[in-house]
Amino acid sequence: MGLLSILRKLKSAPDQEVRILLLGLDNAGKTTLLKQLASEDISHITPTQGFNIKSVQSQGFKLNVWDIGGQRKIRPYWKNYFENTDILELAELLEEEKLSCVPVLIFANKQDLLTAAPASEIAEGLNLHTIRDRVWQIQSCSALTGEGVQDGMNWVCKNVNAKKK
Amino acid sequence: MFISLWEFFYGHFFRFWMKWLLRQMTGKCELQRIFDTYVGAQRTHRIENSLTYSKNKVLQKVTRVVQSEVDKYVDDIMKEKNINPEKDASFKICMKMCLLQITGYKQLYLDVESVRKRPYDSDNLQHEELLMKLWNLLMPTKKLNARISKQWAEIGFQGDDPKTDFRGMGILGLINLVYFSENYTSEAHQILSRSNHPKLGYSYAIVGINLTEMAYSLLKSEALKFHLYNFVPGIPTMEHFHQFYCYLVYEFDKFWFEEEPESIMYFNLYREKFHEKIKGLLLDCNVALTLKV
């Protein structure tokens, strides 16, 4: 292989960009999750008005993670962010047309609390077993300690790969 | 490269000889010359730098002492620098005030930090009373039906229990909200009613908590030094921190409605713009930001 073709090959495989929407109820821990992903300080977080966005590199992907405020008042704005979304992280939105076939990852957060419901219970509560039109996964995690967060992202990268091919 | 070389020579060589030369010419040490030339925050700031970068161990230490020891250290500095209290009577007074401001700023950060680290606790009667006080101040004519209630959204909390909204700011967020509502009641009512604007509206309480974060991080990064050195001739206290918070709340509301953002979804964009504006104002050594109504 000549130098030129190596260069050409490098050029033809730029980082794929993936758009991830983080949605959920207020005080679910979306911003903490986002900051944990970006390895930022999580001790000064305040409720999100509007949204936060961060880009993180993972396994050759550029993940653009959108963290949208969960407050009831701003949920009507969620749909403005649905265009071109690669991964989705909440079940309520499965019927939204713009999001059909988008893989869904549910983070069962706050597992560091003794009172947290286990992932299996949440899966049952959300009737995840009835989802047929897309791949889905439930991942227990603690955004506070970072446990399980990376596992979730690995699943994201794997499934985006499968979807795009 | 050239600049860092210059800084190296200046710090290690020229600064010493410059000071020596000036001392021979004026018969005064650097600290005295600063008192002669500067006032306000610029004076305190220069004294602080002169002490911090001093090669003298006694002088270096004084910016890190506690308030109760300030008197003793002023005497130490005067002994170390051979300053005759009869020839320069004002030195002792000026030095004391500067040291109170310098050490006071550091103490204020520690005090604010300890309040911030205290999470809101529903089992703490004081916390609960403070929360009810906030409701009564903002909604004097409306009764809260229950402690857990959808009504909290009317003053801009997210859910039916405000407890979860304080998060990283802890009880500091609530104390700030109550302080503003109590000391600027009519302004608070006006801002609350404006925040319910159908198009430009925002959530009053959580934006308030967000501005607590702004005030806190400005204090932490030492950006508030010029402001507090100008504003408080002595030890800055919690009260002064709350006052600055009130300034932010009042100014942010004005800024938001002047900018006319498309929707609340652009909050962080405008928040950052406002943050930059405030940081710019705080760079001026004559700054003193007060809420003028």
UniProtKB/Swiss-Prot annotation, chain A:
Alphabetical list of PROSITE patterns matching this protein: ARF
One annotated Gene Ontology cellular component of this protein: Golgi membrane
One GO BP: Golgi to plasma membrane transport
Pfam families in the cross-refs: Arf
Cellular localization per UniProt: Golgi apparatus membrane; Cytoplasm, Cytoskeleton, Spindle; Nucleus; Cytoplasm, Cytoskeleton, Microtubule organizing center, Centrosome
Phosphoserine: residues bearing it: S5
Protein residues bound to GTP: 24-31, 67-71, 109-112
Membrane topology per record: Peripheral membrane protein
InterPro entries recorded: ARL2/3, P-loop_NTPase, Small_GTP-bd, Small_GTPase_ARF/SAR
Cysteine pairings via disulfide bonds: none
Covalently lipidated residues, kind N-myristoyl glycine: G2
Keyword set, alphabetical order: Cell cycle, Cell division, Cell projection, Cytoplasm, Cytoskeleton, Golgi apparatus, GTP-binding, Lipoprotein, Membrane, Myristate, Nucleotide-binding, Nucleus, Phosphoprotein, Protein transport, Transport
GO molecular function, one term: GDP binding
PANTHER family: ADP-RIBOSYLATION FACTOR-LIKE PROTEIN 2-RELATED
Family, as annotated: Belongs to the small GTPase superfamily. Arf family.
Subunit structure, interactors included: Found in a complex with ARL3, RP2 and UNC119 (or UNC119B); RP2 induces hydrolysis of GTP ARL3 in the complex, leading to the release of UNC119 (or UNC119B). Interacts with RP2; interaction is direct and stimulated with the activated GTP-bound form of ARL3. Interacts with SYS1. Interacts with ARL2BP; the GTP-bound form interacts with ARL2BP. Microtubule-associated protein. Does not interact with TBCC. Interacts with RP2. Interacts with PDE6D; the interaction occurs specifically with the GTP-bound form of ARL3.
Record's function text: Small GTP-binding protein which cycles between an inactive GDP-bound and an active GTP-bound form, and the rate of cycling is regulated by guanine nucleotide exchange factors (GEF) and GTPase-activating proteins (GAP). Required for normal cytokinesis and cilia signaling. Requires assistance from GTPase-activating proteins (GAPs) like RP2 and PDE6D, in order to cycle between inactive GDP-bound and active GTP-bound forms. Required for targeting proteins to the cilium, including myristoylated NPHP3 and prenylated INPP5E.
Protein name: ADP-ribosylation factor-like protein 3
Organism of provenance: Pongo abelii (Sumatran orangutan)
Taxonomic lineage: Eukaryota, Metazoa, Chordata, Craniata, Vertebrata
